[in-house]
Amino acid sequence: MRGLDRWIAEAIRSESLDHNGQIICGGLFLEESLPSSSVSFLSSKDCSVNSCRFSQKSSFLKFRRRNGTREPLFLSVSLSINESNGEEEEGEGYNGQNGFKSEKGSVLIGGGQESKEKRRVKENGAGALNTTKHLWAGAFAAMVSRTCIAPLERMKLEYIVRGEQGNLLELIQRIATNEGIRGFWKGNLVNILRTAPFKSINFYAYDTYRGQLLKLSGNEETTNFERFVAGAAAGVTASLLCLPLDTIRTVMVAPGGEALGGVVGAFRHMIQTEGFFSLYKGLVPSLVSMAPSGAVFYGVYDILKSAYLHTPEGKKRLEHMKQEGEELNAFDQLELGPMRTLLYGAIAGACSEAATYPFEVVRRRLQMQSHAKRLSAVATCVKIIEQGGVPALYAGLIPSLLQVLPSAAISYFVYEFMKVVLKVESSA
């Protein structure tokens, strides 16, 4: 068995270390039968002879042969390092040849690559879990917000699909008389089935795109342009994946939709009568509307949030959150606080809805067209203006805003709250 001094000397020569400036911080007693290829040599590139010294305390771990085997006996030695001031500290590990840091008191023996692989698998698993929690936070936000504002959503659709021009109170009375209270939640299940995955993907895509843009730019904070680009990309991504459910919901709410037999019946009817691509009616105006809608919605919210967090009050709140940490309840862990989160969410939603509402009207009309009488998006827009003038493009804007204000406020609040509860790690 080789002595430690001989092993260190050979290791120094093999590592081409500077004797005047570097020192070996670990070693192994090895039997001759154990090949050197199975050992990852540990050295400290940051510890010099002048500034560090070995502690008198060293930890030893002895590995014995298994019964009935002839595996070599070897002994690992872990040496800790002290600063030049003489205070003893335990070593936190040293950089091995495999490129990552070993744990304190450990020596890498033929398992460097395996440990690296285990760490990679662990990181991938943690990333997948974080993504799942992120998606659930967005989905739960959509379910809560849509259920709360389902009656307003129903009235908005009545204005768009039927071209209602009457008094809002008269519309409420008619729905209550003909369909009862449950009529205000008509189509809410399919609405949740549509909006839950939509908002889930939308929120997650925005945070992901924003984080990637931040990494590419190398800035400390996301710029307003990056926020708008990330929001637009998130809107397009969610629209491409979720438009079919939105089309089915619109058909169910339209006159005669009750006879189709629910979501499955409406889906089967559209496939049989108009083909699969009928589920993507209004795709172009949907993409055209969702790109600016997502840009405005997420951009405005993030701009307001960033502006507040740079104020003295915002900085003080962040500092307080950092000091208290997990001792704060979930509401107090919201960076903006409950009320400001609701307010900024409502403002962002109102700005987004007002900016893109005409595209929404055109898209709904396209979804209602039969295959034989289908018009292009431009032709549909022209027809709407011819029949009711430019104000027709904003038909139902008031009930829509009444629906969007609480919806956006609740949605953003629940989303931020669930991220705290589920301990979602930020992408940016």
From Swiss-Prot:
It holds the Pfam family Mito_carr. Keywords: Membrane, Mitochondrion, Mitochondrion inner membrane, Repeat, Transmembrane, Transmembrane helix, Transport. The chain crosses the membrane at residues 132-152, 187-207, 228-248, 283-303, 342-362, 390-410. It comes from the Eukaryota. InterPro entries: Mit_carrier, Mitochondrial_sb/sol_carrier, Mt_carrier_dom_sf. GO terms for cellular component: mitochondrial inner membrane; plastid. Gene3D superfamilies: Mitochondrial carrier domain (1.50.40.10). Solcar repeats lie at residues 129-212, 222-307, 336-421. GO terms for biological process: transmembrane transport. Its main location: mitochondrion. It is found in: Mitochondrion inner membrane. It is a multi-pass membrane protein. Belongs to the mitochondrial carrier (TC 2.A.29) family. Probable mitochondrial adenylate carrier that catalyzes the transport of ATP, ADP and AMP. This is Probable mitochondrial adenine nucleotide transporter BTL3. It comes from Arabidopsis thaliana (Mouse-ear cress). The lineage of its organism: Eukaryota, Viridiplantae, Streptophyta, Embryophyta, Tracheophyta.
